[in-house]
């Protein structure tokens, strides 16, 4: 997937040298293994302002230069109503990383808070819908998000503990509400600690929670649960060193005749359906 060895800046050089094994190689592995990109794709790389999406943007910038097939990229910052301080930080980092992003202003923070005060779920849903709408209007057929390996295993365990379901965060999925649009997660194999290391190596400062309604109470219910599960995984690792790998692998290692039931296209199937046929 590479053809040009030259570098545009120090960030590209670090991606290809110091962080080649932990960022670049795993980025390319995820794209190849899950077939996330095809010739002629127009990718909307979504930038929230945090470390993950900024790292994703720089990886895509490097990939666009080194790929052996043509595809287009649009870098998008969907501004849901950031305060000036946060927006200025995003702009500063975009300039530092040489990411030519388009910033599209919306009023999602205000609208979501007016409808259901402090509703992170509603805000996230509205932001996702806005991303699809904006990306489609720009001619994109895929949107890329900065979820990583640790997000995947945390989400998998959260679903089991909080909702009694066995679901994971997929590397790609078709949009049910926006025909022809697809969501991809190219950093599926990248560990959060390596993104943090990359940011520290370059002395970069990124947004944490940028919601102006939770700045004084950043630990919302969902954020609190996610933090708890991440700590739980950390603690489990002390006794089970392979626990992260095992959680990640579990959704890819399901034996259907050893589970009570599953859903397929919304229809429930029980192990009893064919139990007496044997």
Question: Language-model segments: which ranges?
Answer:
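Short, basic, helix/turn surface patches
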Residues: 126-138, 172-178, 231-250
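ATP-dependent adenylation/nucleotidyltransferase module used to activate substrates
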Residues: 2-158, 162-165, 170, 193-201, ...
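Catalytic subdomain that performs nucleotidyl-dependent activation
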Residues: 73, 151-232
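Long, contiguous hydrophobic alpha-helical segments, chiefly transmembrane helices and signal peptides
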Residues: 27, 187, 248-251
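Catalytic cores of large soluble enzymes that bind and process phosphate-bearing ligands
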Residues: 15, 19, 123, 187, ...
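Short, solvent-exposed coil/turn elements at secondary-structure transition points
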Residues: 79-81, 107-109, 175, 189, ...
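The feature marks non-catalytic terminal segments
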Residues: 204-278
């Amino acid at each position: 997937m590479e053809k040009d060895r030259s570098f545009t800046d120090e960030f590209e050089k670090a991606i290809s040298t110091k962080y080649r094994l932990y960022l670049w190689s795993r980025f390319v592995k995820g794209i190849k293994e899950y077939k996330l990109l095809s010739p002629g794709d127009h990718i909307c790389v979504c930038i929230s302002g945090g470390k993950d999406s900024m790292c994703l943007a720089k990886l895509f910038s490097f990939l666009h230069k080194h790929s052996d097939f043509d595809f287009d990229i649009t870098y998008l910052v969907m501004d849901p109503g950031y305060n000036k301080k946060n927006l200025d930080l995003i702009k500063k980092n975009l300039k530092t990383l040489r990411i030519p992003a388009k910033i599209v202003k919306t009023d999602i923070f205000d609208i979501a808070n007016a409808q259901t005060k402090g509703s992170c779920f509603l805000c996230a849903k509205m932001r996702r819908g806005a991303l699809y709408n904006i990306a489609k209007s720009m001619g994109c057929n895929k949107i890329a998000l900065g979820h990583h390996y640790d997000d995947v295993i945390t989400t998998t365990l959260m679903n089991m503990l909080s909702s009694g379901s066995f679901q994971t965060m997929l590397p790609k999925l078709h949009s049910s509400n926006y025909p022809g649009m697809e969501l991809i997660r190219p950093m599926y194999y990248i560990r959060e600690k390596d993104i943090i290391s990359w940011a520290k190596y370059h002395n970069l400062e990124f947004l944490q929670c940028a919601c102006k309604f939770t700045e004084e109470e950043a630990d919302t219910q969902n954020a609190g649960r996610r933090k708890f599960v991440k700590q739980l995984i950390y603690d489990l690792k002390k006794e089970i060193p392979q626990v992260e790998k095992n959680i990640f692998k579990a959704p890819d290692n399901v034996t259907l005749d050893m589970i009570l039931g599953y859903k397929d296209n919304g229809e429930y199937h029980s192990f009893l359906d064919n139990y007496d046929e044997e």
